[in-house]
Amino acid sequence: MFKRLPLALFSAVLLSVLGGLAWWAGVLYPPIELNGVLTRALGTPEMFRIIHSIFGVGQDGKNIAFVGTTLLWLALTVALGFLPVLLAAPLLGLGLLFLVPWPVALGYGVVYALIRLALTPFKTNSSRATLASTSLSRAGRRNALVTLGGVGVALLGAGITRGSRTGAVDLTLPSAPGKLPTGFTPVKDFFYVSKNLEILDPKIKAANWTLEVNGEVQRPQSFTLEELRALPSQTVDLTLACISNPVGGPLLGLGRWTGVSFAEILKRVGLTANAKWIVWHAADGYTESLPLSEAASLELLLAYEQNGAPLTPKHGFPLRILIPGRYGMKQPRWLTRIEFAAEDRAGYWVTRGWSKTAFVELTSRIDFPLENSPVVKAAQPIQIEGIAFGGLLPITKVEVSTDGGQNWLEAQLEKPVSKYAWTLWSLPWTPEAGSHELKVRSYSSEKVQKEQEEDALPEGATGYHHFIVNAS
């Protein structure tokens, strides 16, 4: 049995390498599709809570999960190597039907069979036929490899059209941004969270992209990026926050966003009486919805610029929707279609137990002193600084405690750059020698930030940001 292991392993690796090459040309890759299936199946708040407790709030958990999925794929294809090729190849093709369309499944089955035939030596029981059989086996392997190469090229060719739709990103648009006021988050520092591995995020070519607007509309239309940019534009300063951001976490940022008002699109397509919901469709299969009645009271923006420059691929190029007062999960990137529907369609994460409404919770954060370096000099005046944010709720007061909440001092607020932006706050403090527990809370009129600590999943984190600072 173990004599077959090298051949089984080599066949599995060669199949995976050819599949990877085909994927770069646009052909679906089974390990990636398998990873997507597992991600969707395990994408519940409870599972994310476990993942975040182990790997934090970044992409590390997704990266490790993909490595695990790839190893699973290799293990399964290696196991096929211990079966006769006439059994293994059909089993592979049939199994892949659960992950990919039948032409791709068939292609993988055929390529795998040819790999096995090309690598398996021919046997003969006649010593007199040794020379002839050796010649035939070499010729057979050579012909099989030629055929394999032809099939591989055909497989790659089949994906060229699809690959051209998701090829290199075209960012030949406006000039570089000017200097932004204090408090804005540079694009390079803006938080990034995706349901995908970053390498699998859509890479859209502007020349091949259109935004389709259809459903319960009177005049279905499609818009190129150039056509959207020709429409009257708006610029909005808006803080975006991720629903998985923990109390005091880094998954929020303030950007200056430019794009087309959603109301402008509404005027151009007109709605039927049946239109009750907006359903957003993204290039990576992500969907979300919003009641049309709520959209009327919000300044929705179809954004194509961030901080004065075109959106980067990570942040949604060529187009994303921005919805004030909601967490990022309600605001898809890489938009390809806006559908007006008579009934709601639960979004990608909603179907997995996440928040239906995703309203931003009232929150505040201490940015200085640093939580990960909480050491200050005793008897030396400093400014405790941070941000507060409430989505659609204006921040009217921020209080800071230096003794763990026994006493509270009111911080000084800076006027926010817009009604959708976070509020910067500061408090002068001269620490005495020793340990001090800093704590912060924010207010919107009579509404106070929730003190009860709750996990970020599924409705958004609550609680006061607090940590110990040592003064010496």
Regions flagged by a language model, labelled:
Residues 31-55:
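Extracytosolic (periplasmic/ER-lumenal) interhelical loops and adjacent juxtamembrane/interface segments
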Residues 3-11, 64-69, 103-107, 142, ...:
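Alpha-helical transmembrane segments of integral membrane proteins
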Residues 118-127, 160-170:
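Juxtamembrane/interface segments at transmembrane-helix termini
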